[in-house]
């Protein structure tokens, strides 16, 4: 599998771009598919300005020594996106490689693309996002200490902080499945700043797992968001928040059929 270490727009500093899947998440996903070789080629300004013909000769032929090239119908390469799938099909016989062009899948009469996924993700439409991606959208990280509020009200939680480049859904509460220690647990996850108990504006991911009672500090977890429950909100009291958290947990269990 050949890909770039960043998306082309990231070369433009004035256009900050967030990623649906980080590089580390992408590597793990590719490995799970049985792909044993992943090339993350450095995308530089020089490469961005490389002529399409030169890209074929230098990258596809000289560096990759490709015999078969598989691309999507909307694949473009080279300066100004001048190269495309048709160019590869036409040039292939001359350079000794075959080009396979894969048609895009559709969902609800709309072509599936990263743009489509982004549009649904920022709206919190997790069911649609997960269908488009072909797997649950997830956030990964190392569990770190929080403010211990969950333990005080006997609803212990795990806190992780996603990479700044990670594209997140709206702040709110979600029904979730979390992987830890090679097992999966149902739970409820809050994304946001926890305004009732904190004045910190840093966005974090806080998850309460059902039927997990071990110490998770320092462990790597993967939180899969399945259903949006409600927006994050500030409650008038700790008691009101605690009551709502219990309600959220029950709702999540019903959504997850636990």
Language-model features: locations:
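Residues in the short beta-alpha loop(s) of Rossmann-like NAD(P)-binding domains
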Residues: 5
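N-terminal Rossmann-like or analogous alpha/beta NTP/dinucleotide-binding catalytic cores
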Residues: 8-95
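A non-catalytic, amphipathic alpha-helix used as a structural packing/dimerization or gating element
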Residues: 25, 128-135, 240-247, 251
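Residue-level signal for inorganic ion chemistry
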Residues: 30, 69, 129, 176, ...
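Glycine-rich, Lys/Arg-enriched anion-binding loops that position phosphate/diphosphate groups
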Residues: 92-192
């Amino acid at each position: 599998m050949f890909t770039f270490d960043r998306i082309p727009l990231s070369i433009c500093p004035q256009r900050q771009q967030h990623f649906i899947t980080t590089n580390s998440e992408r590597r793990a996903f590719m490995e799970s598919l049985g792909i044993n070789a992943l090339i993350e080629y450095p995308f530089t300004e020089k490469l961005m300005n490389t002529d399409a013909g030169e890209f074929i000769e230098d990258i596809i032929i000289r560096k990759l020594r490709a015999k078969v090239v598989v691309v999507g119908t909307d694949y473009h390469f080279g300066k100004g996106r001048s190269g495309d799938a048709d160019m590869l099909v036409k040039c292939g016989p001359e350079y000794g490689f075959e080009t396979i062009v894969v048609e895009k899948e559709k969902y609800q009469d709309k072509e599936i693309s990263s743009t489509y996924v982004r549009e649904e993700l920022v709206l919190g439409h997790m069911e649609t996002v997960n269908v488009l991606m072909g797997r649950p959208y997830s956030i990964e990280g190392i569990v770190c200490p929080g403010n211990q509020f969950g333990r005080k009200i006997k609803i212990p939680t795990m806190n992780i902080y996603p990479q700044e480049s990670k594209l997140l859904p709206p702040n709110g509460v979600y029904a979730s499945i979390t992987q830890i220690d090679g097992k999966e647990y149902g739970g409820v996850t809050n994304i946001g700043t926890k305004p009732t108990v904190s004045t910190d504006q840093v966005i974090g991911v806080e998850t309460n797992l059902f039927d997990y009672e071990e110490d998770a500090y320092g462990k790597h977890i993967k939180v899969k968001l399945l259903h949006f429950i409600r927006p994050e909100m500030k409650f008038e009291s700790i008691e009101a928040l605690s009551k709502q958290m219990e309600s959220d947990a029950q709702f999540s269990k019903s959504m997850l059929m636990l």
